[in-house]
Amino acid sequence: MSYFRRRLSPIKPGEPIDYKDVDLLRKFVTERGKILPRRITGLTSQQQRELTLAIKRSRIVALLPFINAEG
């Protein structure tokens, strides 16, 4: 039987997630521009919701692309 090590949250609880912090947001987006799921990011459910909103806002303001077509 294998055991999985619990991932520590990369963002501290209570730390604000800002849509203008593009470097932070890119860590949670795939090469193709998709938002990574919570089981991979290791965030809490509230942090994941805030992150999703921040990424979507950032896309609307054109800080992040909707689709990364480089590949």
Curated annotation (Swiss-Prot):
Keywords: Ribonucleoprotein, Ribosomal protein, RNA-binding, rRNA-binding. GO terms for biological process: translation. Signal peptide: none annotated. Disulfide bonds: none annotated. SUPFAM superfamilies: Ribosomal protein S18 (SSF46911). InterPro entries: Ribosomal_bS18 (IPR001648), Ribosomal_bS18_CS (IPR018275), Ribosomal_bS18_sf (IPR036870). The keyword rRNA-binding applies. The keyword Ribosomal protein applies. GO terms for cellular component: cytosolic small ribosomal subunit. One of its GO terms (molecular function) is structural constituent of ribosome. It comes from the Bacteria. Pfam families: Ribosomal_S18 (PF01084). Gene3D superfamilies: Ribosomal protein S18. Coiled coil: none annotated. Belongs to the bacterial ribosomal protein bS18 family. HAMAP family: Ribosomal_bS18. Part of the 30S ribosomal subunit. Forms a tight heterodimer with protein bS6. Binds as a heterodimer with protein bS6 to the central domain of the 16S rRNA, where it helps stabilize the platform of the 30S subunit. This is Small ribosomal subunit protein bS18. It comes from Nostoc punctiforme (strain ATCC 29133 / PCC 73102).
